[in-house]
Amino acid sequence: ELLAKQQPQIRLLSAAGEQALQECGLGYRTRYVLHAAQQAAEGTLDLKKLASLPDEALFARLMELDGVGKKVANCVCLFGYGRVGRVPVDVWIERLIRDEFAGQDPFPQFGLEAGIVQQYLFFYKRSVG
């Protein structure tokens, strides 16, 4: 019910507790999401202030959060903050680089649009295997 109709407000997430978040299907991510929501609700993690950071500083700050690695930080940069130059690398992108680009990372050539290109290539690789 917490996520049934819309994205919940930070204060609702932070007060929900682990059980409610587990029921949303977050699995092992539950405590990380809860902790980040609590930090945001308390003001120690200012999500709006993050938006004003340059790409690399935003990425670095996200990497400081518990449970956040390179892929998740890049996903948040790309999808949450519209930083279209960020390229999340998961198993599908690793396979794509290996199979279609002989192990050479193709994304630097796309510059500030690399994240958009990544999405097209991600869906391509997922559909053809």
Question: Where does each model-flagged region fall?
Answer:
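HhH-family (HhH-GPD) DNA N-glycosylase catalytic core used in base-excision repair
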Residues: E1-G129
